[in-house]
Design a protein with these regions (language model features):
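Alpha-helix capping at helix-to-loop junctions
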Residues: 90-94, 113-116, 145
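Short HxH-centered metal-ligating active-site micro-motif
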Residues: 83-95, 101-106
Length: 211
């Protein structure tokens, strides 16, 4: 019942890349999911592959306005974008277990080039043809990390200090169930992808004669 941010996790060894491929196929089908590679210094492949999904909060900043998306509702906030971003980062502090990578808890998203206008007086003459916010940040509850060096996968659930929990025992049981389901995702091949492969093997003939 601590007011601190908490990390609950489990892990397992992997002998091949098949489990990671299964995670890519199954995990990334969900909305607001992502994958990162920790590539450094020009290497082709980094040590960690990081998956994230299930954000409880998403912040969007556009035209000097701040928005919060939570529980399928979009709320306009009074905070200035630059001030709110500082608050988000300041409140995002975790005591990371020694056997977990530091990136086990993270805020993910992007800052567009237009975000420079929040701190610099630059004319806004560009056409917004993509209709995307200047900044979009989210804090994923669910994170999976594949350690390519140790050949180990970490399944992680983040519990944030502002989350309202009425029944702690039920919450803990729900988390255990969620961690189990995540581990199963690494074992199951995506059926849709299997279907696509089967279609690729079909012998297709043209019904248009060649001249």
């Amino acid at each position: 019942r601590s007011k601190k941010n908490q990390i609950i996790f489990t892990s397992k060894k992997v002998n091949s890349d098949d489990k990671v491929i299964n995670l890519i196929d199954n995990f990334l089908e969900e909305k607001n999911s992502f994958i990162f590679e920790s590539v450094e210094k020009g290497k082709i492949k980094g040590r960690y592959t990081i998956f994230g999904k299930n954000p409880d909060k998403i912040w969007e900043f556009n035209n000097q306005k701040s928005y919060l998306i939570t529980e399928n509702k979009k709320i306009i906030l009074k905070d200035k974008p630059e001030e709110l971003i500082e608050k988000i980062i300041e409140n995002f502090k975790f005591d990371t277990p020694k056997n977990l990578p530091k990136i086990c808890s993270l805020i993910s998203g992007y800052f567009s080039y237009d975000a420079i206008r929040y701190i610099e007086n630059i004319p806004n003459k560009c056409k917004n043809d993509l209709n995307l916010p200047d900044v979009r940040l989210m804090r994923p509850r669910t994170v999976i990390i594949h350690d390519n060096l140790k050949k180990e996968i970490y399944f992680i659930i983040n519990i944030f200090n502002d989350e309202k929990i009425s029944n702690y025992q039920k919450k803990f049981e729900d988390i255990k169930s969620e961690l189990f389901k995540l581990s199963i995702q690494s074992l199951i091949k995506n059926l849709d992808n299997k279907t696509y492969k089967e279609f690729n093997n079909i012998n297709i003939k043209s019904n248009t004669p060649k001249n």
